Amino acid sequence: MERKSYSIDITRIAQYAMYAYCIFALFSLAFSVCGQAGLSFRTSPILIPISPILVIIKQLVLQLAPIALWGIFRYTLPAGVKLLRRCSELMGLYYVLSFILGQCFNLHLVTMMQNGQITQMASILTWTESTMGLISVIASLVAGCHLCSKHRGNMRKLGIALILVFIAWLLCSNILPVAVFYLAGNTQQAAFTCMYIISMITTTSAYIYAYYMMYRAIKTIGCIGQ
């Protein structure tokens, strides 16, 4: 790998981004599971004033941390691994687009409903985000397969983690919902609740492991580049 010198400690930034993502991903998981179980953080008098603030911070961290990690990973990659660089750029572009669209919807800059129907602009933006999401998942799989076949150590472990993210997405977003819909019968509501909790735990675990290994890979590349 070619040598790189950094004016700032981007490895430390990646570490902070990874820790922030892990903490707030676990918080989001607990929040969602408690919601499905009929519990609420708002029942606590101590958490009532800070819950809305925590939710806003959680949303921002979970949107911005992946941008930072993928951006740093892309920046640290040597020029010779063009496939990984392109995949990283696609992933970063997807997360940037998701963040921008999320802010547009949250701040009501885009009208979602009009006369009881979804507006054309909202449909176009939602379709664009869904398409980019599918492309990013494929890019993640391609990057994972490349890392597993061409690299060793932490880079190979990152490849395995990215493949696990794809498997989690395939199972939790596509296979499990269809299976529950056709097999659950009269217990669909309870089955969907269990499926949602399992999907949340699986997906969160996969992403936490992937971003942890991405930080390790960035650290490895940074050590080589010094």
Kindly give the residue locations of the regions a language model identified:
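Transmembrane alpha-helical segments of multi-pass membrane proteins
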Residues: R12-C22, K82-F99, K157-L171
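Cytosolic juxtamembrane helix at the C-terminal end of the final transmembrane segment
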Residues: E2-I13, L69-L84, L141-G159, I208-Q226
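Alpha-helical transmembrane segments of multi-pass membrane proteins
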Residues: Y21-L39
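Alpha-helical transmembrane segments of polytopic membrane proteins
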Residues: I50-Q63, S123-V137, S173, F192-A206
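Interfacial non-cytosolic loop connecting adjacent transmembrane helices
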Residues: Q36-S51, N106-W127, L176-M200
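Membrane-proximal helix-loop-helix units in multi-pass membrane proteins
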Residues: L97-N154
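Selected alpha-helical membrane-embedding segments in polytopic membrane proteins
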Residues: L47, S51-P78, R85, Y94-F99
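C-terminal transmembrane-bundle signature of multipass membrane proteins
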Residues: F27, H146, I167-Q226
